[in-house]
Regions:
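Fe-S-dependent hydro-lyases/dehydratases of central metabolism
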Residues: 1-182
Length: 182
C-alpha cells in the first residue's frame, strides 16, 4: 500500500510520507542545506516535526491537474456526511467536469459539507481573482506546484496533497492521513 505524500517545503521535491517527520537538513548534501533551511523558515516548520497534525487555514481542491471527475468523486467520498473546519474551495477542472459532477450530485455533497462549489477556473491555483491566501495562511492544495508566494500571498504557505487527503485535512482542520478514518 502506498502511503499518502505531502510537501513540507517550497518545491514538490520537498515532500514526505504523511506519517513522517520533517527531515533534518544535516542529512542532505551540504550544497542543498541553504535551500532547505530557507524552506523550513518560509513554511514555519521545524526539523523533526511531524507533518501530520499541522494546523491549516484553507483547503483547495482544484486546478486543471487534480480536479478531474475521478478526483472530485474521491474527495466527495471523504466529505459525505461530514463538515469542514476550514475554508474549503472545490473548483472543477473544466466546465464539462463541473456539469458531470453536478449530474452525479457531487456538488450537493461538497456544499452540505460546508465547502464552496465553484465554476471551473484557476481560482487559488493561480490566485488571479479574490481566491487567494492572506498573510501567513497555510493551505493544503491539490495544485501541482508550490513555491514562495504561491496562491497570492507573499507569505502564504502551500502544502500539496491528493484530493482525498485535502478533503480529510479540511474535515480535521489539520494535515490528516486519509487512511486513518476515511
Amino acid at each position: 500500500e502506498l502511503e499518502p505524500m505531502v510537501t513540507w517545503g517550497i518545491t514538490p521535491a520537498q515532500s514526505i510520507r504523511v506519517s513522517e517527520k520533517i527531515p533534518e537538513i544535516n542529512n542532505f548534501y551540504e550544497d542543498d542545506r541553504p535551500v532547505l533551511a530557507k524552506a523550513l523558515e518560509y513554511m514555519d516548520v521545524k526539523e523533526g516535526q511531524h507533518i501530520k497534525g499541522l494546523p491549516i487555514d484553507v483547503a483547495f481542491i482544484g486546478s486543471c491537474t487534480n480536479s478531474r471527475l475521478s478526483d472530485l468523486r474521491e474527495a466527495a467520498k471523504v466529505l459525505k456526511g461530514k463538515k469542514v473546519k476550514v475554508k474549503t474551495l472545490v473548483v472543477p477542472g473544466s466546465q464539462d467536469v463541473r456539469a458531470q459532477a453536478q449530474k452525479e450530485g457531487l456538488d450537493k455533497i461538497f456544499i452540505e459539507a460546508g465547502a464552496e462549489w465553484r465554476f471551473a477556473g484557476c481560482s487559488m491555483c493561480l490566485a488571479m481573482n479574490p481566491d487567494r491566501l492572506h498573510g501567513t495562511q497555510r493551505c493544503v492544495s491539490t495544485s501541482n506546484r508550490n513555491f514562495m508566494g504561491r496562491q497570492g500571498s507573499p507569505t502564504g504557505r502551500t502544502l500539496l496533497m491528493s484530493p482525498a487527503s485535502v478533503a480529510a485535512s479540511a474535515v480535521e482542520g489539520k494535515v490528516a492521513d486519509i487512511r486513518e478514518s476515511y
